[in-house]
Structure formats: structure tokens, C-alpha cells
């Protein structure tokens, strides 16, 4: 097959991919590459970005190989994808410059064909971590989910959902999918105008599903006379979903990072939501901190969206799986247990602990819950499930609801 793009395009892609070491998010690394090559126009950058992310999603066995093999893989597979119109990008023979690469020489030998085909056929994205997967999560489930570029889900902020949808359509943006109070658009759409004015906020459909508490027992405590603590709030995405459903909730948010809590305050103000109580705390040492700024002794609901490997979101940053060290699973699992051990004393009798991860690994999910229940006889499992995932083409969000019975 004749290449859709000139050799220099594949050469530049292969060089960028080979030199990436996983130390920073790939989209930031890519920005630095673009900055170094100012002669690449906006269409060039779009093509490079599409090719690189196609590689991370599909090149399961060749990502750590030589630049030659990476280049040849792109020529074989990315060209086919563009030819089959699986990628919505413009094609041209004028990409980048006409200079020849100084790092890579063109080869398309039978040996390269054999290497690329063999590696591509013997790997799937989660094969190397299959032994760590949660119950009922298999590589057969994860593979088609991983290789498909995710949509971006958003909900209405300070306007109605109908109003938001109307604005997007008027701007020529196609609504790809709807579910409940959420809309999905292509990942290529620039949503900054709607996010920056508070008309919308971005949150994956699975996270929104995990925070849909209308039919959950903890909904009884989401009002002004009860106390809810989002103990690992980050920038407040889950809390925003909560207050959208229950606007009078007496909410407290904490995180170890004070700067991200400043972001949380700004988001709540922009969206016109009730201001939560906010404090900074390192939950690894929470119980030992006599100077804690925690304003309440007990809470009726504690939401623990704990730090994790993020393996249930890897298709958003597909490079992560190519550099993943399985030893970090245990590191995160131990940290998660430490956090839960330190917040359980602040849970009121009869109250609920909502444990969330965006991981597909058992050690971070059901194994941790078993340890929590084994060490706390006064806790009782109410439910556990994965929210969203393949059914909604969203992230894999694990949710466990636990009640403190005495």
C-alpha cells in the first residue's frame, strides 16, 4: 500500500515515540516537541497527535522496540486506519518538512514485516497485568474498550441541560451521545468556552454514574442537617455531581494539596454551587494530627475517592500502560487502606462510607474492601460494583458502599 503520508512524517513520529520515556504525560511531552518544531502547522500537529495516540492504543508489542520497527509499524497500521477512515484527520503529502530524518533510515524488509506482525498479534493492552484484574474484568473486555478513543462527557453547570445542548449545536458541535443529564462530544472539540464561563463541567459518564445517589441509601443524609465529607476531593468533580443532585448538602472537602483546593473553590463559585467547608489534611497521618482543621467530629457520609493506579482510565492516557510497573499496585493499595483506616473513626454510626477507585485491579478494589471489613467488625458491606465502563463507553469506576452499624 502507498503511504498516505510521506516518509518524513513517519520518521518524525517514530523519533518522538521512541524518545518518550514515560516520565511526563505524553500530551505535555508532545507539546514540547511541537514547540521545538515551529514549522509544523496546526494540521501537522493534528496529524502527529493522531498518529502517536493511535500507536499507543494499538502497538501493544512494539512500543519499546527500535525506531525502525516503530516507523514500520506506523507505515503498516496507521496508513491502513486512515485509508479505512477510522481516523477523522485530513490527509496530505505535504506534512511537516521535506528534509530527511537524520535518526532513522527507511526499511521495509520481510524481517521487519515479520517482527511487526508477530509482536502485534501476540499482545493485548492488559495482558501483562491480567493476573491482577478484578473479578469479572478480563482482557477480552478491556481490549476493545482501550483501543477506542473515548468521548468527552459534560454536564450543565449554571444553565439548563437543554440550554447547553442548544449552545453546542448552534456552535456546530455534534452531540455524539446522551445519558441522563450528560452529553458526549468528540475529544477533538474545544469545550473551553463553556467550561470557563461555568455553563458546563467535564466529567466522565462513569464518574457521574458512580455519583448518582438518588436511589442509594446514602441519599438520606445528603441535606443541610447531615454532614458529608469528600475526604480526597481533588478539584471537586465528585462533590460537584453531589451538589447538583442535592443542593443543600452540608459538604466538607479536604485534600493534601492546598493549591487544588483553591481550584475547587473557584469551580464551585463559577458553577453557582453552595460553598463547602474546606481544609487541608494528609490522611496518612490524620488521626495523629492533633492540630487538624477538620471542623466536624463525625460525618453521616464519607466519600473516599482514593488515589489509585488509574488503570480504569488508561485509554485516556494510553501511554501509561506501556510504562506501567505492577509493583505500584501494592503501593497504592497500602495507601488506600491507610486512608480508610484513618477516616473510619469519623464516620457516624449508621452512616455510609463510599469507596471509589478508577482502577481495574483487585488489590485496590475488592481485596481492600475485604481487609477493611475484616479489621472493622462494625462495618457492613452494602454493595459493590463497577459503574459505567464498557456499557457506557466510559471509565471503569469501582464503587463500594459500606455502612457503620455500631
Can you name each region flagged by the protein language model?
Residues 1-406:
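S-adenosylmethionine
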Amino acid at each position: 500500500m502507498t503511504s498516505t503520508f510521506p516518509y518524513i512524517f513517519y520518521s518524525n513520529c517514530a523519533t518522538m515515540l521512541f524518545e518518550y520515556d514515560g516520565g511526563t504525560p505524553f500530551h505535555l511531552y508532545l507539546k514540547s516537541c511541537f514547540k521545538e518544531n515551529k514549522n509544523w502547522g496546526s494540521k501537522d500537529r493534528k496529524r502527529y497527535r493522531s498518529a502517536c495516540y493511535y500507536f499507543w492504543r494499538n502497538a501493544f508489542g512494539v512500543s519499546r522496540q527500535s525506531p525502525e520497527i516503530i516507523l514500520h509499524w506506523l507505515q503498516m497500521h496507521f496508513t491502513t486506519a486512515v485509508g479505512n477512515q477510522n481516523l477523522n484527520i485530513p490527509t496530505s503529502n505535504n506534512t511537516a518538512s521535506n528534509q530527511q530524518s537524520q535518526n532513522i533510515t527507511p526499511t521495509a524488509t520481510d524481517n521487519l514485516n515479520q517482527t511487526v506482525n508477530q509482536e502485534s498479534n501476540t499482545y493485548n493492552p492488559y495482558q501483562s497485568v491480567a493476573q491482577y484484574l478484578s473479578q469479572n474484568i478480563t482482557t477480552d473486555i478491556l481490549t476493545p474498550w482501550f483501543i477506542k478513543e473515548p468521548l468527552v462527557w459534560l454536564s450543565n453547570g449554571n444553565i439548563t441541560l437543554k440550554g447547553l445542548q442548544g449552545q453546542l449545536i448552534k456552535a456546530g458541535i455534534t452531540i455524539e451521545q446522551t445519558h441522563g443529564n450528560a452529553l458526549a462530544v468528540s475529544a477533538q472539540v474545544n469545550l473551553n468556552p463553556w467550561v470557563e464561563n461555568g455553563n458546563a463541567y467535564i466529567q466522565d459518564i462513569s464518574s457521574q454514574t458512580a455519583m448518582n445517589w438518588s436511589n442509594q441509601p446514602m441519599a438520606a443524609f445528603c441535606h443541610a442537617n447531615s454532614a458529608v465529607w469528600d475526604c480526597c476531593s481533588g478539584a471537586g468533580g465528585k462533590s460537584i455531581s453531589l451538589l447538583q443532585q442535592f443542593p443543600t448538602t452540608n459538604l466538607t472537602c479536604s485534600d493534601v494539596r492546598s493549591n487544588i483546593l483553591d481550584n475547587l473553590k473557584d469551580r464551585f463559585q463559577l458553577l453557582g454551587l453552595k460553598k463547602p467547608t474546606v481544609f487541608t489534611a494528609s490522611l496518612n497521618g490524620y488521626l495523629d494530627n492533633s492540630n487538624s482543621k477538620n471542623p466536624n467530629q463525625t460525618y453521616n457520609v464519607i466519600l473516599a475517592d482514593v488515589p489509585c493506579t488509574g488503570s480504569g482510565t488508561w485509554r485516556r492516557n494510553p501511554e501509561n500502560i506501556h510504562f506501567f510497573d505492577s509493583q505500584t499496585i501494592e503501593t497504592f493499595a497500602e495507601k488506600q487502606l491507610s486512608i480508610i483506616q484513618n477516616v473510619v473513626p469519623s464516620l457516624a454510626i449508621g452512616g455510609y462510607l463510599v469507596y471509589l477507585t478508577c482502577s481495574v485491579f483487585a488489590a485496590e478494589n475488592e481485596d481492600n474492601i475485604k481487609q477493611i471489613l475484616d479489621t472493622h467488625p462494625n462495618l457492613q458491606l452494602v454493595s459493590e460494583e463497577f459503574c459505567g465502563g464498557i456499557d457506557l463507553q466510559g471509565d471503569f469506576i469501582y464503587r463500594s458502599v459500606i455502612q457503620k452499624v455500631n
